[in-house]
C-alpha cells in the first residue's frame, strides 16, 4: 500500500528519509551532507518521483523510486 508522504507527521517522515539515506549501500561514497540528501528525497516525494510503500507482511516502510513501484499500485 502506498502511503502519501504528506499524511505522515513531519518527524516520522524525516526519520524515515534519514534511515533510507544513511543505509549501507545508499551513499556510494557520496560525501553530500545528510541534510542535502534528505532534501533531495523530500523533493522526489513531492514531485511524484518517489513513493513510500508499506509492506503489510513485514510491517515495514520502504522508499521506492517511481519505476520500482508495482504498476497496479500507481493506477
Swiss-Prot record:
Organism's domain of life? Answer: Bacteria
Q: Write down the InterPro entries for this protein, in alphabetical order.
A: UPF0270 (IPR010648), YehU-like_sf (IPR036685)
Which ranges of the sequence are coiled-coil? none
> Cross-referenced Pfam families, in alphabetical order?
UPF0270
Concerning HAMAP family, the annotation shows:
UPF0270
**Sequence similarity:** Belongs to the UPF0270 family.
Question: What name does this protein carry?
Answer: UPF0270 protein PSEEN1465
Amino acid at each position: 500500500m502506498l502511503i502519501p508522504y504528506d499524511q505522515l507527521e513531519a518527524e516520522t517522515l524525516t526519520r524515515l528519509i534519514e534511515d533510507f539515506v544513511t543505509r549501507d549501500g545508499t551513499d556510494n561514497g557520496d560525501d553530500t551532507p545528510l541534510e542535502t540528501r534528505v532534501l533531495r528525497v523530500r523533493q522526489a516525494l513531492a514531485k511524484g518521483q518517489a513513493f513510500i510503500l508499506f509492506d503489510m507482511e513485514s510491517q515495514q516502510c520502504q522508499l521506492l523510486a517511481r519505476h520500482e513501484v508495482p504498476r497496479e499500485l500507481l493506477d
